[in-house]
Amino acid sequence: VVLERQRSMRSRPPDRLVEEKARLRQVCRDERQHRAHDAGAPLAAAFLDAIPLAADAVVSGYWPFPDEIDPRPLLTALHARGHALCLPVTAVGAPLRFRAWTPCDVLVSGPFDTREPASNKPEQRPDCLLVPLLAVDDDGYRLGYGGGFYDRTLAVLGDALGVGLAFGFQRCGRLPRGAHDCPLD
C-alpha cells in the first residue's frame, strides 16, 4: 500500500518520456511475473489497519490481471464492514466510470481484457480508489499500462483517495513523468 501526497509535476520531452516509460513497463512486467500471487490476504489486513475510511466511504477496486496483486480479499473485507464497492468501466480516451459491485456479482468482458460490472448496475463516485500499477515512486507517481485512464480519473475526482497496490520491489526513487501524470495519495 503506497500513501504519498501530490507533488509538483515536472515534464520531460514527450518522445523521451514515452521511451523511458515503455522500457520501465517491460522491466516491471518481467519482474512482477516472478512474484507470489497470494498477497491478497496480507494486503487486506495491512490496509484495514493502516487506512482510515469513513463508514460510508465508497471504495473502487479492480479485477486483477494474473500478475497483479489481487484486491478481492480486501474488497470482500470492506464489503463485510458495510462499504459500498464499485469497479471501473473503461471507455477509450475518457476517465474511468464506476459501477456498483458486490463480491457475488457476475462481471462482463470489457476493453483491454478487463472485467467490469454489467451496464444495468448503477454508477457510483468512489471516495477511495484502489489502483493497480507497475511501479510507483517516492512522490506517489505511478507507472501504469500507458492508457492514462487512472491519471484522467484522479484528475477529475480530485478529492478521492488514490491508493496504489504494489509489491515492495515496485517502489522506486523517481519515475519519469509528464504534465498529465497524477500522483497517488
Feature roles, as predicted:
Residues V2-Q124:
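N-terminal active-site beta-alpha-beta segment that forms phosphate/nucleotide-binding
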Residues V2-R23, D30-H34, N120-L129, D137-R142, ...:
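Surface-exposed, charge/polar-rich loops and edge strands
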Residues T76, Y145-Y150:
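Charged helix-capping and loop-helix junction motifs
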Residues C28, G61, L85, L130, ...:
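A residue-level signal for conserved active-site and pocket-lining positions in enzyme catalytic cores
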Residues V58, L107, Y141-Y145, L161:
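Generic detector of intrinsically disordered, low-complexity, polar/charged segments
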Residues P64-D67, L134-D138:
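Short glycine-rich anion-binding loops that position phosphate/pyrophosphate groups of nucleotides
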Residues V89, E116, L133, A166-F169:
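Short, structured patches in soluble enzyme cores that scaffold and shape functional sites
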